[in-house]
Amino acid sequence: MLKASLKSIASYIPEKILSNADLEKMVDTTDEWITRRTGIKERRIASENENTSDLGTKAALKAIKRANLKPEDIDAILVATLSPDYFTMPSTACKIASNLGLVNISAFDISAACSGFIYLLEQAKALVESGLKKNVLIIGAEKTSSIMDYNDRSICILFGDGAGAGVVSLDNENHILDVHTASNGNYGDLLMTQRSQKSNLCQTLSMQMKGNEVFKIAVNTLSNDVVEILAKNNILAQEIDLFIPHQANLRIIKAVQEKLNLSDEKCVITVQKYGNTSAASIPMAMNDAYEEGRLKKGDLILLDAFGGGFTWGSALLKFGGENF
């Protein structure tokens, strides 16, 4: 039976750093409060002339190279983002395909907010294992600064920019074991990007969140989801080599880590230096672990994410990339 594998991981991190000290000068907040409530110390911000597709392209090129492929070997591009270059069309995936010089291939975006990378894995796995595609490029890319209200202290402290990418291809040895995704649209108004009511041209967008409600639901949902996917696959939490969660809030991460009774050595945390990069956070965290030598070929990895929609998901996989 055909098995899909994540054969590479890479990221692109913008140069500009927006620290908590910087935010103290912009809104009524403090470094102490941000750190205590979120665990975030700084986040990266893309330059004005960098679009989401630019961030994604830079991560994609590294991911393709690390998979020992060339751009022309890719036959599908899937992008997860909540901050696309264009409001409706063309898709960010099509822009990245153009940047890579690729035509006549499948390219589309997935809108699943912070859960986007889990959704990408599920779709790429299905495409490869069905035999429809051979090498699927998956990209989580975000320029959240483009939809951020930097006068709203409740949300501007949380988010940053960046991109992560990987290639999913066949590998019957180190493959994606299972992916679970789900949603509940009844909570959609707790975390959303609101269109300005002053214009029907959709020129003004801003992210809005009811943080306390989101926090409670996220902790309960993620804790249950990771327990269920482990049980379904007859895997004990202690068998996991690395737990790489969506990097939204340190308190959420720690709550799920405690539920699984995992040591700090098995939990990858990058929220302190990148903030919440939405669909890019998991591949960015994976890449940090990869380049640090913590993520190695054959390692058993548990991923989880929760985002607007609400959407959520988890994945179990054995990493198929060569060691860094």
Curated annotation (Swiss-Prot):
| Gene3D superfamilies for this protein | 3.40.47.10
* UniProt keyword annotations, A-Z: Acyltransferase, Cytoplasm, Fatty acid biosynthesis, Fatty acid metabolism, Lipid biosynthesis, Lipid metabolism, Multifunctional enzyme, Transferase
Q: Does the keyword Cytoplasm apply?
A: yes
A single Gene Ontology CC annotation of this entry is: cytoplasm
Q: Top-level EC class, please?
A: transferase
Family annotation (SUPFAM superfamilies): Thiolase-like (SSF53901)
Function of the molecule: Catalyzes the condensation reaction of fatty acid synthesis by the addition to an acyl acceptor of two carbons from malonyl-ACP. Catalyzes the first condensation reaction which initiates fatty acid synthesis and may therefore play a role in governing the total rate of fatty acid production. Possesses both acetoacetyl-ACP synthase and acetyl transacylase activities. Its substrate specificity determines the biosynthesis of branched-chain and/or straight-chain of fatty acids.
Q: Which HAMAP family does UniProt cross-reference here?
A: FabH (MF_01815)
Q: How does it assemble?
A: Homodimer.
UniProt note: domains: The last Arg residue of the ACP-binding site is essential for the weak association between ACP/AcpP and FabH.
Q: What is this protein called?
A: Beta-ketoacyl-[acyl-carrier-protein] synthase III
